[in-house]
């Protein structure tokens, strides 16, 4: 799928008054934030959608930037941030076009970014790892291949889903603090709802 096609796909999906993934933060992101993040941190939310996760992080007092390739989603994110009285740097960008800077962020959140095919995924993980400051945290949640049985969200493409061996390879050079496969109930708007096959990941960049 080309950038133009992908942008149209997500614009069409987000083009509704409803927040399709809800306005509450991802449960695992919230848990990991409370466990690992504190202080005056610069945080990046990758492919942030309608802003539920970036708004939560900003409400914790962090300095947050977030990007998504859908202008429709970014406009909804801005409205959600305004409603919650937080300031966030929102940008329209895809993962390849984002201006990645080395050793820039104290934390990066990548929640359900499985639109990325294997080639894009490899580039994206390389960028995220490079952009983390040493000693800082990468937080990821995504679907495992078993998700295709549940059909409760996700791309439905096996090659886009996470396995433990894949994640260990992608995170080469980082210390993995959490790497857990599990099944659990998701209730995130009307598009992530029901029993789901999940992978939770937290990794730290060595000093």
Language model features by range: what are they?
Residues 135-142:
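Conserved beta-strand signature within the Rossmann-like core of class I S-adenosyl-L-methionine
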């Amino acid at each position: 799928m080309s950038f133009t096609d992908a942008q149209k796909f997500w614009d069409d999906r987000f083009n509704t008054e409803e927040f399709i993934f809800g306005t509450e933060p991802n449960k695992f992101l919230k848990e990991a934030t409370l466990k690992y993040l504190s202080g005056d941190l610069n945080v990046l939310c990758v492919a942030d959608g309608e802003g539920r996760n970036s708004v939560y992080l900003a409400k914790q007092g962090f300095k947050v930037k977030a990007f998504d390739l859908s202008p429709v989603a970014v406009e909804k994110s801005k409205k959600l941030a305004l409603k919650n009285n937080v300031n966030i740097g929102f940008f329209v960008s895809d993962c390849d076009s984002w201006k990645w800077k080395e050793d820039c962020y104290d934390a990066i959140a990548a929640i359900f970014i499985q639109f990325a095919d294997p080639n894009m995924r490899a580039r994206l993980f390389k960028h995220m790892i490079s952009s983390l400051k040493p000693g800082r945290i990468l937080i990821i949640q995504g679907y495992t291949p078993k998700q295709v049985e549940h059909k409760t969200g996700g791309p439905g493409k096996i090659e886009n889903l996470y396995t433990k061996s894949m994640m260990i390879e992608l995170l080469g050079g980082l210390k993995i603090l959490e790497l857990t496969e599990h099944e659990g109930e998701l209730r995130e708007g009307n598009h992530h709802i029901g029993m789901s096959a999940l992978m939770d990941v937290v990794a730290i960049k060595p000093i």
